[in-house]
Amino acid sequence: MGLLEVLDPEDLPKMSTWYALVPRGEGPSARVGHTCMYVSSSEDSSKGKILILGGADPSGCYSDTHIIDLDNHEWDNPDSEGLLPRYEHASFISASNPGNIWVFAGAEQAENRNCVQVLNPGAASWKSPKVMGTPPSPRTFHTSSAAIEDKLYVFGGGEKGAEPVADTNLYIYDAATMTWTQPVTSGDPPQARHGHVLTALGTKLFVHGGMAGSTFFKDMFCIDTDTMKWERLKTKGDLPPACAAHSSVAWKSYIYIFGGMTSTGATNSMYRYNTETLLWKQLKFDSACPPARLDHSMCLLPWKTRTNTDNAEKLPCKAKEESNLKECSSATSKTLEQGIVHLCFIFGGMDTDGELHSDCCVTILQ
């Protein structure tokens, strides 16, 4: 596995290339089951932050918070207290109060959790608010991509070992009202599973992969939260193998997945799913790729670059690949004039030989 080129602050990344992101200072130790999120700033001049929450290694679970301050490209380790140790949990930011960081579920060494905790802007400690309604049973539920507006959507999750919870209901946590609800759904829902990705895009939620016992899944489901009807999608193209413990991000009309565990071991492949054409495409890279991994975390990173419209030539248009990319060139130029490109950011995870990672890797979305 070759070394990745380092992407320095405000550098414009090349297409089809993986980079290492190397902030100054001491970052998190190698771990699995953590979550990561990009947190924007209310100040236009700010580049925002990346938060990494919790996780675990063979010695136990973490309750720490690590931050990449993108303005100074440094790690920050705040002294916030009160986060219960947990891994393979969910995290999200509510749209109506974007300063609040929420976590749900996960596990520690003795048991699974189903509690909700929140960190308010400027607060020194996490709070465990009293919530209304009936929450899902304790479970692992590893995602940071399953929220729409103020609502976290929960489907499936882990019970113990390789077994999922038997519950196949959909649950909604509304951060604005701090209330759990369980909507009535129709259609063809996924069977019980854990280690799947649950990704929100617009009003829809997409479920891919996961596992139950020794069975790995490669199917794709969708539920529109306006109609609450499940649909099993008939996808085509470069179908990803059956896998679990992978990660996902949504951008434009696409869902990207990276890594995970298959029946033959961990992978470092990346796929793009077009939600409009139902087409999967395996992405190819001109550089080395990050080491294969599972149980890592991934988020969408708006990356501010030195503004230079001449750089548009460095981002070749792939319009011939899919018809809905015909305006790629003009969109690319506009993005570069604004000085922003969108990256996929991954941190941590492990391979099937037990090696844990503590690296930050990025690639531009295409």
From Swiss-Prot:
Keyword Cytoplasm carried by entry: no
Keywords carried by this UniProt record: Kelch repeat, Repeat
Highest taxon, organism lineage: Eukaryota
Gene3D superfamilies: Kelch-type beta propeller
Pfam family, one: Kelch_KLHDC2_KLHL20_DRC7
Swiss-Prot/TrEMBL Kelch repeat ranges: 49-95, 100-146, 151-200, 204-253, 254-303, 343-366
UniProt-listed InterPro entries: Gal_Oxase/kelch_b-propeller, Kelch-typ_b-propeller, Rab9_kelch_effector
Keyword Ion transport: no
Role description: Rab9 effector required for endosome to trans-Golgi network (TGN) transport.
Protein name in UniProt: Rab9 effector protein with kelch motifs
Origin species: Xenopus laevis (African clawed frog)
